[in-house]
């Protein structure tokens, strides 16, 4: 089985984990926790990624937890954090986990150098010492210990709020670290909003992020039956907060593409993700498009915005036979297809 570069570096440092009760969190994407369980006394995983949670939950020797924060009471004496791409998300994870497990907790941090992991030493200073022990495969590995008291973790402290005014709709957006649209409303989403037809019936906002698209759609078309979904617990919690602060209602679902969705829908609408961590990632969007006919009513419509260089028209034509470009700029294109 192949492991990520970060996991390969962890495998060089097994002495840190022998006989320990380890909690792993962060930018996890492979099955290395299962391998580590052969060395550690126990291995638990905390993830904000619903797809990863599903894959790890199949293993009897892994105690897997999904959510926006870790609520379960666990007996842990070592944290292993895979450094996220977003520095704010790394800060969030350390603050949340160290507040839970407190002083004298040991921590190992691993990550690709281009992910910003080399800032870990400075970011860990409020908690205690952190020392680099390995550097290989363009990754760095650190060990440290929380020696200082940690202030209680309050999720509300981590939301960023910002106003938007798009297509005549004024809203407040609430987003957590690591969530798409954390602090800004992107031009692709603006183009999509300004291109959408008059919506009716059941509408799915796929890959909802902080809920910006969904909130605008609901504000402009209050009678639609709207569902927002995302693979990220941080995104789902952000979207819920965005809707709450704007007094809007919708259904929110954590899902791995269609895994938890029922359908059918009148509209599948998305600014689909193509970045997962540091790697360009098309698989989720490919599956979203390929399975779209199974989740659309007979007259249902798929509408997505994408970078113009991406090969989505071919995928859409394979799935729904025809693909139309409704609008475009020099960077983005709105694609549409009817069942």
Curated annotation (Swiss-Prot):
Enzyme class: transferase
Reactions it catalyzes: guanosine(1207) in 16S rRNA + S-adenosyl-L-methionine = N(2)-methylguanosine(1207) in 16S rRNA + S-adenosyl-L-homocysteine + H(+)
Pfam families (alphabetical): MTS, MTS_N
GO CC annotation terms, alphabetical: cytoplasm
Listed EC numbers: 2.1.1.172
Keywords on record: Cytoplasm, Methyltransferase, rRNA processing, S-adenosyl-L-methionine, Transferase
Major localization class: cytoplasm
Source organism superkingdom: Bacteria
InterPro entries: DNA_methylase_N6_adenine_CS (IPR002052), Mtase_sm_N (IPR013675), rRNA_ssu_MeTfrase_C (IPR023543), RsmC/RlmG (IPR046977), SAM-dependent_MTases_sf (IPR029063), Small_mtfrase_dom (IPR007848)
Annotated compartments: Cytoplasm
Molecular-function GO term, any one: 16S rRNA (guanine(1207)-N(2))-methyltransferase activity
Main function: Specifically methylates the guanine in position 1207 of 16S rRNA in the 30S particle.
Similarity remark: Belongs to the methyltransferase superfamily. RsmC family.
Entries under HAMAP family matching the protein: 16SrRNA_methyltr_C (MF_01862)
Quaternary context: Monomer.
Name of the protein in its database record: Ribosomal RNA small subunit methyltransferase C
Organism of origin: Photobacterium profundum (strain SS9)
